[in-house]
């Protein structure tokens, strides 16, 4: 268990209020340098800012371990390359972030639980936020280089994802609980290969999808429970010019034995789908009558893209 957090925390935690961002980062770096292994978060409540992954690291949350993420936006600077509703940009760091990593995981019976006070205010999407979105739409539609799309400034209030893995390979998300999220809950963006299983997701804020796979391929999602404020499982493929530039469909996705307790849609496609979606198979999943739709494909005349080979079986 290279890079285990127990000893690091014993040296640095005081009164349960120490922000452990640096301690976690050091443990992940040590684990990566040693060739990989598990970074263990022990039982207890640990306050932290963003967690940035390196290859060959499993962040393991022991039972009754709670990672509590701060809600101070400055903790999530400097900005990192991410995406917002299908458009690439530099924004506040996601709470758990990986870029160009391989063989990474979050496992264990612990809980990810961000503090939500600031993000709840940002849910309201005031005029400066809407103006910032228009600015980002314009930059994306005119092919402004991504590094110039700096959105973590002023009152833009573009909320960070809870989990955002970007261009990663061999991903495992297993067993842990999620309790609330600033924006999309789990966003797997241009990732290749992975398993998402045994998750318990409860998040009822604005835009809180259960899981979003965007321009990703070769994933299995199984035995998860989704109780969220938007759609449960969402398959996306980028928006307009960015997606046409990246030219990467979302494909080869299996979803099985998952339950949705509350939310809008069991399986959604789009509306970011300009790169195309194909080969999605959902079976043996359940949703209550209160869910608006079992399946919903969303697009508009500007998106382009395609939807091919969608199967749903034994869904009720």
What is each residue range found by the language model?
Residues 36, 47-50, 70-72, 92-93, ...:
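Short glycine/acidic-rich loop motifs that flank beta-strands on beta-rich extracellular proteins
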Residues 1, 76-96, 125-158:
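Surface-exposed acidic, glycine/proline-enriched linker/cap segments
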Residues 63-64, 102-111, 169-179, 192-203, ...:
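Right-handed parallel beta-helix
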Residues 34-82, 89-92, 111-112:
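N-terminal extracellular ligand-recognition/capping segment immediately after the signal peptide
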Residues 24-30, 34, 283, 301-316:
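Beta-rich accessory regions
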Residues 1-9:
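Single conserved hydrophobic/aromatic residue that forms the stacking wall/gate
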């Amino acid at each position: 268990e290279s890079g285990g957090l127990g000893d690091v925390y014993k040296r640095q935690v005081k009164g349960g209020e120490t922000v452990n961002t640096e301690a976690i980062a050091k443990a992940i770096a040590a684990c990566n340098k040693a060739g990989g292994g598990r970074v263990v978060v022990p039982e207890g409540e640990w306050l932290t800012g963003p967690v940035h992954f390196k290859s060959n690291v499993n962040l393991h949350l022991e039972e009754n371990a709670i990672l509590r993420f701060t809600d101070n936006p400055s903790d999530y600077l400097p900005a990192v390359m991410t995406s917002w509703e299908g458009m690439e940009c530099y924004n506040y760091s996601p709470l758990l972030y990986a870029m160009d990593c391989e063989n990474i995981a979050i496992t264990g019976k612990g809980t990810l639980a961000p503090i939500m006070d600031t993000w709840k205010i940002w849910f309201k999407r005031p005029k400066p936020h809407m103006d910032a979105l228009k600015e980002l739409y314009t930059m994306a539609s005119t092919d402004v280089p991504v590094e110039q799309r700096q959105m973590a400034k002023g009152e833009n209030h573009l909320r960070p994802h809870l989990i955002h893995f970007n261009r990663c390979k061999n991903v495992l998300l297993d067993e842990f609980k999620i309790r609330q999220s600033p924006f999309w809950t789990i966003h797997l963006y241009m990732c290749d290969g992975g398993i998402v299983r045994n998750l318990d997701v409860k998040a009822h804020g604005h835009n809180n999808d259960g899981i979003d796979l965007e321009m990703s391929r070769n994933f299995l999602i199984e035995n998860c429970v989704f109780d969220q404020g938007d759609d449960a499982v969402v398959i996306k493929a980028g928006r307009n010019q960015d997606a046409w530039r990246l030219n990467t469909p979302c494909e080869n996705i299996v979803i099985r034995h998952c339950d949705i307790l509350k939310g809008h849609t069991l399986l959604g496609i789009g509306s970011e789908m300009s790169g195309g979606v194909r080969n999605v198979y959902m079976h043996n999943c359940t949703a209550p009558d209160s869910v608006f739709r079992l399946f919903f494909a969303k697009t508009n005349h500007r998106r382009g893209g395609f939807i091919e080979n969608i199967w749903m079986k034994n869904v009720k």
